Amino acid sequence: MIKLRDISNVNPEEFDEVWIICRSIKKLDRTILDNPKVKHVPDLSPSMELFYAYRKWANQGVWNTFLWNEKYVPNFLEQMRNDVKAKTYLQQLTDESKSKNIALVCFCRDEKMCHRSIVGGILYHMGASIEIKDSYEGYHI
């Protein structure tokens, strides 16, 4: 079973694996990174271009559900659609979700407007055993 979490609310000991799906892990405590259950998988994170666009919108105070739905989501889905390595990881997660307890984590506190919700929707449509909110079911590649 896959569960979506923000990194500040995850205890690696509660999971078989913890997948950190963000580009940078510089701000993370070494005790988390040194845990053998923890994997850093930047291939399931937004491209630098999309991440910087998000940061720009957030810093300008204009980040909202319109930009999320009209700009961020379509760009991230397109990125996942065209990334062979990302698709390999998505398939691995789908397969492992049947026998392992896995946390997908990122720094974002608002899960609804975080790429992990999109990844969750993609995994749901791929047949993964995943705990998601209904609103994520619209995300697929």
Q: Which residues does each predicted region cover?
A:
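Residues lining hydrophobic/aromatic ligand-binding pockets adjacent to catalytic sites
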Residues: 1-141
